[in-house]
Amino acid sequence: KKESLYFASKKKDVSWLQKEFEARKKAGFKVKWLEPEQISKKFGLQKTFGGTISEQDVSVDALKFAHELLDFDAKKGLKIFDKTEMKSVKCHKTFNEVLTTENHRIKAKKIIYCIGYESKSLIKEDFVQLKSTFAVVSEIDEKKVEKFGNTLFWNTDDPYIYMRTTDDGRLLIGGGDEDFRD
């Protein structure tokens, strides 16, 4: 459980962010409005124009979560073919068959595709709109990130900036989703 600060990065964003704050408050969320000075004092962020802070937010370490899911399912019998490149997939009536780039065949009732962007070339149905997002992660420095604590940060820019600490003392900064181009 984390708190989340959504702050105005431009003066013109303050009025609609205050409306967002009121809507969240009316919906029963535990939110407070912070003035720029309060944000600066609590988090060391400069040049904000105020923001809403919520006590009800979460974040997930995607890599750790994915590995925990794999471990859980492997214990239940899931066969994992890590670092196996798929050349093709044929769907038969009672099973599916994967042909690998090494010309091995894998037969299974069900296939879980954990392949990211390559899914577009292997799955015929057009069910995915791929996005690219940008992120950087600092070196481990628990002292430098302790002021940010357990807070998620979002600004009102377009593209937005997202910031949070990681469990191992890094600062992750990301944002700027855009349509994927190969």
Where are these regions (language model features)?
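Active-site substrate-recognition segment that forms the wall
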Residues: K1, M86-C91, N96, R105-K143, ...
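Dinucleotide-binding Rossmann-like beta1-alpha1 core, especially the glycine-rich loop
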Residues: K1-P36
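Short, structured patches in soluble enzyme cores that scaffold and shape functional sites
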Residues: S9-K11, E102, I140
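Hydrophobic alpha-helical scaffolding
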Residues: K10, V58-S59, D126
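Helical element adjacent to the flavin cofactor pocket in flavoenzyme catalytic cores
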Residues: W16, E22-K25, K47-K110, C114
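Beta-strand segments within the central parallel beta-sheet cores of soluble alpha/beta enzyme folds
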Residues: L34-I39, K83-K87
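Flexible hinge/switch segments at interdomain interfaces of large molecular machines
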Residues: Q38-Q46
